[in-house]
């Protein structure tokens, strides 16, 4: 079995990330979704995510197999939600954006590893509420988040001229004790960088 792990994306990952994103854009278009069909996200989006250390890559056998952005600051488009409400509207939350699995690895369960690791990183930052949004035609993403017990909370609008409405999901984890001591030293470098 190949080594599979999550790490922060680096500038040298940008070409691999963009290949994955371009493949995802084509798949979304093929599946009838207007999501990501207006030039977003682009290379500058991911360069910014890498610069702010919010983009993560799932590595499988030394290759970038998946990418996602874990934003720990409030998402402006989540201020206004219709057809529902956030369960924890005033609590801190992390937003998971731009989730994509390489076409070379689709169907291998890597989305579970990616989400599990992102939730762990968020929890290590003291976050227990996570949000994500996706287009109503993006059935694959809906399936992934619903399998992780994200609950559909309503509709938000993003800056997309084609179709701005997105389904808004939220996961509220129980109260956990703050991590104060780590026995497995192989994780310490990652934790120290958070």
PLM features: residue spans?
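Conserved beta-hairpin
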Residues: 54-70
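Conserved active-site alpha-helix within GNAT-family acetyltransferase domains
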Residues: 112, 124, 136-154
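Conserved acetyl-CoA-binding loop-helix of GNAT-fold acetyltransferases
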Residues: 101, 107-120, 143, 147
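Conserved acyl-donor/pantetheine-binding loop and adjacent beta-alpha core of acyl/acetyltransferases
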Residues: 69-100, 106
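Conserved GNAT-fold acetyl-CoA-binding loop/helix
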Residues: 25-45
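Conserved GNAT acetyl-CoA-binding A-motif
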Residues: 115, 122-134
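Conserved N-terminal entry element of GNAT/NAT acetyltransferase domains
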Residues: 1-12, 175-194
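Conserved beta-strand-loop-alpha-helix junction that forms the acyl-donor binding cleft
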Residues: 106, 132-142, 160
């Amino acid at each position: 079995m190949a080594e599979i792990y999550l790490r922060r994306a680096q500038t040298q990952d940008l070409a691999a990330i963009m290949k994955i994103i371009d493949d995802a854009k084509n798949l979304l278009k093929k599946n009838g979704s207007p999501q990501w069909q207006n030039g977003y996200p682009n290379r500058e989006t991911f360069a910014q995510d890498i610069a702010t250390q919010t983009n993560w890559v799932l590595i499988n056998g030394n290759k970038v197999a998946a990418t996602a952005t874990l934003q720990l600051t409030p998402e402006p488009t989540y201020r206004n939600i219709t057809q529902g409400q956030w369960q924890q509207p005033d609590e801190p939350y992390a937003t998971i954006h731009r989730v994509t699995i390489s076409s070379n690895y689709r169907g291998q369960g890597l989305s579970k590893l990616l989400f599990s690791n992102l939730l762990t990183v968020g929890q290590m930052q003291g976050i227990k509420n996570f949000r994500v949004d996706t287009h109503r035609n993006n059935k694959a993403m809906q399936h992934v988040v619903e399998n992780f017990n994200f609950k559909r909370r309503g509709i938000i609008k993003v800056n997309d001229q084609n179709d701005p409405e997105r389904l808004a999901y939220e996961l509220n984890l129980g109260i956990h004790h703050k991590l104060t001591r780590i026995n497995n030293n192989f994780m310490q470098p990652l934790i120290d960088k958070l």
